[in-house]
């Protein structure tokens, strides 16, 4: 029996499957870089992503190893925080986060993963109080931590994260 044609077919199928995954991964990286540029364009004093600010503990910090699911959950929290801010500066970034989460879902799907829906997350109870007390600090801390998280996600995408 001749296996050579089957081997060629298999290598072709592997290549065809890898292309969409790579396209989604490249698009995701490009959007992350765009969001980081938008954050840099907003002139705020830089705050360390590791710095603790009272009342803002619900805003995710840095996570060294992220799965696609954890990336999506983290971005969902940031999206929720940014959409709660009245600042016009963060509207486009919040929209970009929604698009980024959609790309992560496509990337997960292309890897035969399914990400849980996180669109119905509960709003952190302390968010309204913090926003009322200090809008500016919340925006600065959220954007600073988001930027750090996006850099982590970018690095994780280079090593092909798990589901």
UniProtKB/Swiss-Prot annotation:
One of its GO terms (biological process) is cellular response to leptin stimulus. Belongs to the leptin family. This is Leptin. It comes from Gallus gallus. Keywords: Disulfide bond, Obesity, Secreted, Signal. One of its GO terms (molecular function) is hormone activity. PANTHER family: LEPTIN. Not exclusively localized in adipose tissue but is also expressed in liver. It is found in: Secreted. InterPro entries: 4_helix_cytokine-like_core, Leptin. Its main location: secreted. The keyword Secreted applies. Residues 1-18 form the signal peptide. One of its GO terms (cellular component) is extracellular space. It comes from the Eukaryota. Disulfide bonds join 113-163.
